[in-house]
């Protein structure tokens, strides 16, 4: 199966982008956000809930039998072999602090195996996607790794007091 053109994968990419654009709107008016504390250094905002809602609604409309596991709402059982895993704002602490290093993340699982993942950075407008057996992409361009035959380990340098 070519996962890149799979209906679920195309939907995931579209929903992650849509949620990211909504997240950017919230981020640009961060002072107006309702922010709750879930635990020490663990926050949830109305933006987290709204972004997860956009993603959940899109999944449910297109694939009503799929299960969904979201960070904010939790697990919704399904009847198919698919589970969608959602982190609507990965980096909520940064988000609520006005630090522009947060992303929207969705993974697609089939028969207990992760088959695709999508990470969207709306600040930089960069989409990362990866497919089981199909490679990884940045904005649709295949990413590659550099083959290294030897990794050089630097010697420690003593820093003298200035």
Which residues are covered by each model-predicted region?
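Short beta-strand motif preference
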Residues: 84, 104-106
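Acidic beta-strand-loop-alpha-helix segment within the catalytic core
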Residues: 106-154, 158
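Conserved catalytic motifs of the protein kinase core domain
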Residues: 81, 101, 113-115
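N-terminal subdomain of lithium-sensitive/metallo-dependent phosphomonoesterases centered on the IMPase/IPPase/PAP
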Residues: 1-89
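Glycine-rich, Arg-bearing micro-motifs that act as flexible, cationic patches
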Residues: 96
